[in-house]
Amino acid sequence: VPATDRRPIRDRARTRRAVLDAAERVVTRHGANVSLAAIAREAGVTKSGLMHHFPSREDLFAALVEQVITRFWEEVNAHVDPGDDRPGAFTRGYVRALTGDSAYLAELNSATGLLAQLGIDSMEHVLAVDPEDPARWNRAFEADGLPPGRVWAVRYAAEGLAIGIGTAYVTDEQLRLARAELLALTETAPE
């Protein structure tokens, strides 16, 4: 095989993704103070290989937060029914994703999930990595066709439920009832 046809076993993008996925798993299991060596081991790369892609811990964590931002958006949009052109379709997808239909978001928002492990300043991390993130979400909700007060109430109630899932504070029955009520609020005609 000519040298120009050879491809590395792992290309740059795949290695970067493997490191970020490993960082998500390891930080979720062991907390934000986990060593870079532990993340590298989980990713199947050397620590110097990790450092090649992420020269500092801060660079790695910024990229990790960026991946979470992207994945959160993708998960919500995956739960928006493409055939639903009624007002509230995006908000319904958001409620479904945050209240149990997305295994990724359930783990992310759990009491021991990645957001909890990153600490109370995780929103500051989000803003530092992607200052446009809040505006992107706000635009999506504002364009959804529901009255503003209703869309914000449903959104923030869904976020509260998401944080309580899997704890003694939100039983399965309470989740079922609250989710049904939130979805019903997105079905009613705009006032």
Where are the model-predicted features located?
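Helix-turn-helix
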Residues: 18, 22, 26-59, 63
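Amphipathic alpha-helical elements of HEAT/ARM-like alpha-solenoid repeat scaffolds that form extended
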Residues: 111-119
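N-terminal intrinsically disordered/low-complexity leader segments
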Residues: 1-14, 191
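Alpha-helical DNA-contacting segments of helix-turn-helix folds
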Residues: 61-68, 75
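Amphipathic alpha-helical interaction segments
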Residues: 18, 89-93, 113, 152-157
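Hydrophobic/aromatic-rich alpha-helical bundle segments in the mid-to-C-terminal region
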Residues: 105-108, 123-191
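Solvent-exposed, amphipathic alpha-helical segments
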Residues: 22-29, 75-78, 157-164
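Hydrophobic alpha-helical connector segments
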Residues: 75-112
